[in-house]
């Protein structure tokens, strides 16, 4: 759910009448966001923190409060972009430098474009639908083969409710929500490629599923639990926090890994349907000289647990782990439009041990990104 800052809408403190500066900022930010989106979309053909498949959307943690609430009977549409390039391999929290030295790094280039439509049913209750679209590529440094996947991801239908009536809660509030993850995304995108990478002899064409980290779909249903809250610390500083957890049905999605089935590690023969989560927090400060502009800073923690919340089955191949990132962001509101952007740098990455890893006494690796780029545009009507 894309949330909006209480320090922006209906703000009466520290406003400026410098309309020329406002127009310049509006044009500059609009051009900047459009340029970023074009560059990111053209740089590669996902939801994911590299190989571990933590799929969280655009920046969504900005607080909602007095004047920033969506009025009953009104809609808002948000289009968000997430971009990252994952190539640094970790086993646990140990960086595998030899992968770079040997040029065996696996590189995932990911773009996730999400469209979210929210309807404010009552002052406290809102309904939403979230439609992601994935563009992703994957290749190994020492191989000419490049895999790609594009398509609609898994859809989320949800409802959110404020604990307190927002009209009477200008200083703090908490929203909780429930939703359902619908497996509308394809979890079995296949590529045809030449497996003869020696450059000698005739081509050997192979058709097989791409790695699950760039598949648009997860292959299973899920229960979405989310929350968002804020606390005004003073007239110019607001603390915000939010998170979500997607508890899936578990088991496997039936998509086979590799050309042949393993007899030594049968639990890894098929792809697991994994849970995922996101936690974030931060502070927001208005930029007093420009009406509608504010800056944010805070950390994010997103990842895939080794074991699902519902104890159905943890069989199947997954790359569990998490990445903690932190960085600055910004939000600009003009009329019925809101622009947000953020750049988050990794401060801790950890590829944890999966359930099959614990059974077979192994510990696989995963590729992580150094930076995550987020941007969104929201229109209210």
Task: Identify the meaning behind each predicted range.
Residues 81-87, 131-137, 163, 180-186, ...:
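Transmembrane beta-strands of outer-membrane beta-barrel pores
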Residues 43-48:
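Sec/Tat signal peptide C-region and signal peptidase I cleavage site
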Residues 135-272:
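Outer-membrane pore/translocation modules
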């Amino acid at each position: 759910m894309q949330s909006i800052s209480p320090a922006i809408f209906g703000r009466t403190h520290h406003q400026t009448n410098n309309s020329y500066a406002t127009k310049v900022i509006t044009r500059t930010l609009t051009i900047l966001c459009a340029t970023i989106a074009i560059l990111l979309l053209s740089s590669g053909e996902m939801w994911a923190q590299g190989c571990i498949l933590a799929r969280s959307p655009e920046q969504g943690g900005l607080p909602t409060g007095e004047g920033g609430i969506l009025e009953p009977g009104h809609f808002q549409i948000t289009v968000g972009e997430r971009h990252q390039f994952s190539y640094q391999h970790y086993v646990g929290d140990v960086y595998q430098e030899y992968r770079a030295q040997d040029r065996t790094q696996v590189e995932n280039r990911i773009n996730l474009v999400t469209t979210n439509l929210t309807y404010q049913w009552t002052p406290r209750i809102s309904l939403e639908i979230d439609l992601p679209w994935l563009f992703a590529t994957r290749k190994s440094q020492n191989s000419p083969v490049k895999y790609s996947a594009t398509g609609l991801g898994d859809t989320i239908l949800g409802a959110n409710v404020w604990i307190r009536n927002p009209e009477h809660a200008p200083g703090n509030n908490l929203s909780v929500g429930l939703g359902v993850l619908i497996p509308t995304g394809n979890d079995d995108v296949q590529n045809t490629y030449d497996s003869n990478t020696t450059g000698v002899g005739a081509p050997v064409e192979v058709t097989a599923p791409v790695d699950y980290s760039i598949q648009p779909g997860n292959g299973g249903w899920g229960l979405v639990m989310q929350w968002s809250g804020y606390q005004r610390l003073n007239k110019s500083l607001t603390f915000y926090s939010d998170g979500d957890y997607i508890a899936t049905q578990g088991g496997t999605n039936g998509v086979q890994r590799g050309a042949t089935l393993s007899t030594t590690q049968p639990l890894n023969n098929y792809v697991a349907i994994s849970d995922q989560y996101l936690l974030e927090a931060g502070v927001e400060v208005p930029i007093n000289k420009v009406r509608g502009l504010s800056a944010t800073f805070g950390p994010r923690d997103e990842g895939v647990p080794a074991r699902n919340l519902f104890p159905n089955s943890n069989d199947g191949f997954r790359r569990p782990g998490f990445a903690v990132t932190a960085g600055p962001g910004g939000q600009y509101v003009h009329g019925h439009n809101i622009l947000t952007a953020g750049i988050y740098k990794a401060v801790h990455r950890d590829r944890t041990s999966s359930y099959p890893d614990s059974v077979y006494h192994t510990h696989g690796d995963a590729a992580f990104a150094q930076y995550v780029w987020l941007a969104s545009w929201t229109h209210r009507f």
